[in-house]
Swiss-Prot record:
Modification sites for N-acetylserine: S132
Glycosylation site positions: T71, N91
Protein name: Pro-opiomelanocortin
Compositionally biased spans, kind Basic and acidic residues: 125-134, 217-233
GO biological process terms on file: calcium-mediated signaling; cell-cell signaling; cellular pigmentation; generation of precursor metabolites and energy; glucose homeostasis; negative regulation of tumor necrosis factor production; neuropeptide signaling pathway; positive regulation of adenylate cyclase-activating G protein-coupled receptor signaling pathway
Propeptide residue intervals: 106-129
Annotated organism of origin: Ovis aries
Pfam families linked to this entry: ACTH_domain, NPP, Op_neuropeptide
Length: 263
């Protein structure tokens, strides 16, 4: 009877061990050692036969398990499934995934740890070789200054010297004189008359401007600056003389009505 209880307890222990494992292979229970579980020796033999399978499914390091070497390189672990992963792509659902992010990180580390002189005379990295970022696409990126104008190169040396010696206005006058000389005396007379008219117009405008400055300011460029008197206030504030024909008309109508009633 005690042997039967011990065998039952052993079988129960074996069943619990088999259920605790992640996956149990079929050959362990179908082996000849696990067919007869009535005796304690057969039970222990079955447990020993199934123990390697259990340890392969759920590996446990007895004792100093923390000191055992890791199967995976911890540097390969990158949180590529998070959007703030700095080594992975922005889209976590990309074809590479976390593996591509880890590979990218390893490449960056390999580039940083590659052979090359270091110290005070170290070579500048690829990031240091890049030009400093200047916000040229913004209007406030660079200080506002005078725009560079293209330098005009003349084929003749005389024209270049004249451009440096005379300012733009004198240069225009010189070109105008050359054209007049090429046209003839009639064109010169016409241009002289046009110049005289232009000068007269400029003098007249200057005198008119002086008169305006001396007098009171009037908003003549607006339509309400100085309206005529008969159109002020919508034509209601007019003189009494303009209303006399209307008054006489009303008087005549009233007199006619009175005569008709009296008859």
């Amino acid at each position: 009877m005690p042997r039967l209880c011990s065998s039952r307890s052993g079988a129960l222990l074996l069943v619990l061990l088999l259920q605790a494992s992640m996956e149990v292979r079929g050959w362990c229970l179908e082996s000849s050692q696990c067919q007869d579980l009535t005796t304690e020796s057969n039970l222990l033999a079955c447990i020993r036969a199934c123990k390697p399978d259990l340890s392969a499914e759920t590996p446990v390091f007895p004792g100093n398990g923390d000191e055992q070497p890791l199967t995976e390189n911890p540097r390969k672990y990158v949180m590529g499934h998070f959007r703030w992963d700095r080594f992975g792509r922005r889209n976590g659902s990309s074809s590479f995934g976390a593996g591509g992010a880890a590979q990218k990180r390893e490449e960056e580390v390999a580039v940083g740890e590659g052979p090359g002189p270091r110290g005070d005379g170290a070579e500048t990295g690829p990031r240091e070789d890049k030009r400093s970022y200047s916000m040229e696409h913004f209007r406030w990126g660079k200080p506002v200054g005078k725009k560079r104008r293209p330098v005009k190169v003349y084929p003749n040396g005389a024209e270049d010297e004249s451009a440096q010696a005379f300012p733009l206005e004198f240069k225009r006058e010189l070109t105008g004189e050359r054209l007049e000389q090429a046209r003839g005396p009639e064109a010169q007379a016409e241009s002289a008359a046009a110049r005289a008219e232009l000068e007269y117009g400029l003098v007249a405008e200057a005198e008119a401007a002086e008169k305006k400055d001396s007098g009171p300011y009037k908003m003549e460029h607006f339509r309400w600056g100085s309206p005529p008197k008969d159109k002020r206030y919508g034509g209601f504030m007019t003189s009494e003389k303009s209303q006399t024909p209307l008054v006489t008309l009303f008087k005549n109508a009233i007199i006619k009505n009175a005569h008709k009633k009296g008859q």
